[in-house]
Design a protein with these regions (language model features):
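N-terminal secretory signal peptides that target proteins for export/translocation
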Residues: 1-2
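Bacterial N-terminal signal peptides
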Residues: 6-16
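Sec/Tat signal peptide C-region and signal peptidase I cleavage site
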Residues: 17-21
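Flexible, solvent-exposed loop/hinge segments and secondary-structure transition points
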Residues: 22-188
């Protein structure tokens, strides 16, 4: 029985392979469609460095020290910078904020608002590696996500990222408002 099953499986695989090879022409993309599939929109190092510098200048004006991570849409580090005085957790959270933007395709502050009063959702996001704390913003050009910026270490992380994006790339969508914490019922 096992021998017959193995032979049948091999024959099916062989038949599928030759059948698929005969139809390969149906799946070939050429001309303009091919150019579109090969073109990759991703933030370049030069722009990432400009964003970082603008963020560092903002931090200095506000007497803060920050860490900045710029990631590609696939999560690869394009540029990172740590100002003096940063502790390891600030460095880690800056990268986590940028990654969270890529996972959710939204600002990390928007995720913070979403989970503000929902412990169950906080736990689910955490299990997925999403860090719902403000300071991460998408980098969007012509409606296309080309990367993410994450800033950690200061009390104005999101403002730092936003200021950098508007000064280097241009006008950005408005930042989401903060969600106030749920009212705690008075003890009885």
């Amino acid at each position: 029985m096992g021998y017959r099953c193995a032979i049948a499986t091999a024959l099916i695989a062989l038949g599928a392979g030759t059948g698929a090879a005969q139809n390969i022409g149906k799946f070939v993309i050429s001309d303009e469609a091919a150019k579109k599939t090969l073109f990759k929109n991703e933030i370049n190092v030069e722009t990432a460095e400009k964003l970082t510098q603008a963020c560092v200048e903002f931090a200095k004006r506000n007497n803060q020290a920050v860490t900045v991570f710029i990631l590609s849409p696939t999560g690869q580090i394009v540029h990172s910078y740590r100002m003096d005085g940063q502790v390891p957790i600030n460095i880690e959270t800056a990268e986590l904020k940028a990654k969270s933007v890529l996972y959710t395709r939204d600002s990390s502050h928007a995720r913070a608002n979403q989970v503000a009063n929902n412990l169950s959702l906080q736990m689910r996001w955490a299990a997925l590696g999403v860090f719902p704390v403000s300071g991460g913003l998408p980098i969007i050009v012509d409606g296309q996500l080309i990367g993410a910026i994450g800033v950690g270490g200061g009390s104005k992380d999101e403002e730092c990222a936003y200021t950098a994006l508007t000064s280097v790339i241009g006008p950005q969508p408005a930042l989401p408002p903060a969600t106030p914490p749920a009212a705690t019922p008075a003890p009885r």
